């Protein structure tokens, strides 16, 4: 008794094995990508939330691809292998469907990436605006700091100048007061000789020059000392009454020139 056995075409067996191998490879690839995604997520959880960079954008893209592949893997697990006749029309139809699906997935990914890029662009513009504002504030503060420093220097110089001016004015006033007091003292105690006695009349007549007071002689010696400190000597003139000169020399108020006795200078009491 013979049994009817249904023979399976070798090409059909080969096609089924190819589909199974493809599914296993796809599952293996998805598992590897899933493991990589978990590692990346663990690293990101340790780093914390930061502004997206190029690496973060690529990571987001990989995560979306992983989700798509996971969904596709789930569909593959639910599907049962079917023996499909591998003719040209069927393959063309399947290829179109796969390409259409891939196109939809890529358009979705592209839309997501464009949305993230727009957000990053807005964040960049906002950060750039903040940076420009901070730079303007910094420039303004630098200008104010420079103005304050210049003002401080100006105020310091002005204050010093005013203080020196006040001191000079006070010294001049004290000098005038001192000269007036000295002049009054000298006029009272060392007046010019009067032509009341014959001896004085003869001494005055012998000199044709007009005699000057002791105060005027001292002022001349003082001015010479401060105006020409390197040559403070004054030549004795006919208008200098000789007793005045002897008085100044005797009490050490004036000194003769070591080489020219006709010149005298004031003793440098200030040195």
UniProtKB/Swiss-Prot annotation:
GO terms for biological process: chromosome segregation; kinetochore assembly; positive regulation of transcription by RNA polymerase II. Keywords: Centromere, Chromosomal rearrangement, Chromosome, Coiled coil, Kinetochore, Nucleus. Component of the CENPA-CAD complex, composed of CENPI, CENPK, CENPL, CENPO, CENPP, CENPQ, CENPR and CENPS. The CENPA-CAD complex interacts with the CENPA-NAC complex, at least composed of CENPA, CENPC, CENPH, CENPM, CENPN, CENPT and CENPU. May interact with Sox6. GO terms for cellular component: inner kinetochore; nucleus. The keyword Coiled coil applies. Component of the CENPA-CAD (nucleosome distal) complex, a complex recruited to centromeres which is involved in assembly of kinetochore proteins, mitotic progression and chromosome segregation. May be involved in incorporation of newly synthesized CENPA into centromeres via its interaction with the CENPA-NAC complex. Acts in coordination with KNL1 to recruit the NDC80 complex to the outer kinetochore. Residues 11-44, 102-151 form a coiled coil. It comes from Mus musculus (Mouse). InterPro entries: Centromere_CenpK. This is Centromere protein K. It is found in: Nucleus; Chromosome, Centromere; Chromosome, Centromere, Kinetochore. It comes from the Eukaryota. Belongs to the CENP-K/MCM22 family. Highly expressed in testis.
């Amino acid at each position: 008794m013979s049994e009817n056995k249904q023979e399976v075409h070798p090409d059909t067996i080969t096609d089924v094995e190819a589909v199974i191998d493809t599914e296993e490879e796809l599952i293996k690839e998805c598992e590897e990508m899933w493991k990589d995604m978990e590692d990346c997520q663990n690293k990101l959880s340790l780093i914390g939330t930061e502004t997206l960079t190029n690496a973060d954008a690529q990571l987001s893209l990989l995560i979306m691809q992983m989700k798509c592949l996971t969904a596709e893997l789930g569909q593959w697990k639910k599907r049962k292998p079917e023996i499909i006749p591998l003719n040209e029309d069927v393959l063309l139809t399947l290829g179109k469907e796969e390409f259409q699906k891939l196109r939809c997935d890529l358009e979705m990914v592209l839309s997501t990436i464009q949305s993230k890029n727009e957000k990053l662009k807005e964040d960049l513009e906002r950060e750039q605006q903040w940076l420009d504002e901070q730079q303007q504030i910094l420039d303004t503060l630098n200008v104010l700091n420079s103005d304050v420093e210049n003002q401080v220097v100006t105020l310091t110089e002005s204050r010093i100048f005013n203080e020196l001016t006040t001191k000079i004015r006070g010294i001049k006033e004290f000098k005038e007061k001192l000269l007036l007091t000295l002049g009054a003292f000298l006029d009272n105690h060392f007046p010019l000789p009067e032509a009341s006695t014959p001896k004085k009349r003869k001494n005055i007549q012998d000199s044709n020059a007009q005699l000057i007071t002791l105060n005027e002689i001292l002022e001349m010696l003082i001015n010479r000392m401060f105006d020409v400190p390197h040559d403070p000597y004054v030549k004795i003139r006919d208008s200098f009454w000789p007793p005045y000169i002897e008085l100044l020399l005797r009490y050490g108020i004036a000194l003769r020139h070591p080489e020219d006795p006709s010149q005298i200078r004031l003793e440098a009491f200030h040195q």
